[in-house]
Amino acid sequence: MKFKTRLLVGGLFLPLLLGRNVHGQAPFYQGKTIALIQAGEAGGTGDMRVKAVIPFLRKYIPGNPNILVEYMPGGGGRKAANYIFGSARPDGLTIGTVGGVVANAIQGQAGVQYDLDKFIYLGAPNATSHYVFVTRGELGLNSLEKLRAHAGLRVGAHAVGHFVYITGRFFAWLIGLRDPRFVTGYSGVELDANLLRGEIDSRANIADTVLQRNAELLTKGLVHVHAILEIPKGDKHPHPRFASLPEIERFARSDKESKALAMFRAFRLVGTPYILPPGTLQERAEILREAFRKTFRDPEFHKEYKKLTGDDAAPLLPEEMEKAIRELPREREIVELFQKIAGPDALPPR
């Protein structure tokens, strides 16, 4: 299988006599290369999160293996998840990091060829987040009333099923946009550029990404910011521009709508999980789980994560992630509503 981009992280040669265990046997991972399958493009926020993790993961895996990042975008994470589930060898040398892997499975999205409950979960660095909905400043939509009155707003996103796509759909649905059009197929960086060029009118984005990558959009008045999604609910963003925004659940009209949004919050709470193929040898899986625990507890990791992403790391440890996935709401009526919101068809009536 060909991958779009490859990035080798770490030294190519390690002294063979280093890192031996108490019995004189070299650790399994010494001299090995781990393939880290990333379900996304290079250069976006997700890529920065991975780059923050890699050096610490190498540090805490006995034997300090090389880590080769292989970018595998497509299908809102389904392409990468299907590969890890069905094609990757369960030898402990393939790790995936896949946004949408949980939501796609619970929704029953077309193209899902994996069993969510059979992956081995290693945790995630980003269990909390804030998403904002922005429109191009030139449109003059500087109030919710003007936003609702504007017909045919072009909402840019990644692929159907991607977190940013679903978030944009929730904003459009709950705010009550008139006949929004969803334009997909962009990376995060492309969305920013196309918004400025006027090829799209609006997008959902991570609040800290706006501050980190596109602060001039705010300072120069190039965008209007309309609402925020807090994950978890009640976790206020510290920036004054975002702290005063209406939280998206304010626009829900029924308990059913609130539950659909709560399901999405739960999906996002598990973040972009690191996963292993089903059947990975238990001993190697535990080595990797412990390496992730140590990474997420390392104060230096938190500093590096902040530097690269602009956000504070909020890790979910392996055992916490497994518990969160077991307890995800799977009520059929709510799943069906969520699926309509997250899918390619017109938004459901309210």
Q: What function would you assign to each model-found segment?
A:
Residues 1-9:
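Bacterial N-terminal signal peptides that target proteins for export
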Residues 7, 73-76, 309-312:
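Short, internal active-site loops enriched in acidic
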Residues 9-19:
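Bacterial N-terminal signal peptides
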Residues 20-24:
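Sec/Tat signal peptide C-region and signal peptidase I cleavage site
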Residues 26-271, 329, 343-349:
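Conserved hydrophobic/amphipathic secondary-structure segments
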Residues 30-32, 220-221, 225-226, 243, ...:
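An extracytoplasmic/periplasmic, membrane-proximal ligand-sensing/linker region
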Residues 41-42, 277-281:
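Structural beta->alpha junctions
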Residues 271-277:
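A short beta-strand structural signal in non-transmembrane regions
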